[in-house]
């Protein structure tokens, strides 16, 4: 899973619009993830370089927004950002690396997928992935830094859409309702049907469900 946007520019290699500078010459991207806690599906990360000439009203932590507003802002970010990239780490990578390292991998892939090379990555949380550029971890950054808010929205909407698609293949789990989180409905379905290939075997409730069917 990877989606990127190229920078805008006129014919003949016209210069790009002014970038999101923290300091002269600084190009900042915001980075966030969605899906660390669920029992199923990939962890998704996004990186966004916003265009200060085209501000987006209403950016916030994706968890504080309604699904309808997230979808609207998703379209605005895709249309107005100077660059964005969405990447993921698979269930297999989550199980082999652990969820923390898989999350860092997804973030690294998202930053490396940007078509504009940033000089600074602002990461939501208290850890940064290993990057070739400087990075800064900001706890609660998805509610404080607009570019991180934008990344939060892209990651959340992309992951939710992925789980809706998985629901079409495995309707018995109700992925469209809980996006893979360990709700009572999901746990009951795990006990009744056992896990599917998209469940994270390294997570305790899934391991326990596997043990029940052995």
From Swiss-Prot:
One of its GO terms (biological process) is mismatch repair. A divalent metal cation binds at residues 32-33, 124. Residues 26-214 form the RNase H type-2 domain. Its EC number is 3.1.26.4. Disulfide bonds: none annotated. GO terms for molecular function: manganese ion binding; RNA binding; RNA-DNA hybrid ribonuclease activity. Its main location: cytoplasm. HAMAP family: RNase_HII_B. NCBIfam families: PRK00015.1-1, PRK00015.1-3, PRK00015.1-4. This is Ribonuclease HII. It comes from Burkholderia pseudomallei (strain 1710b).
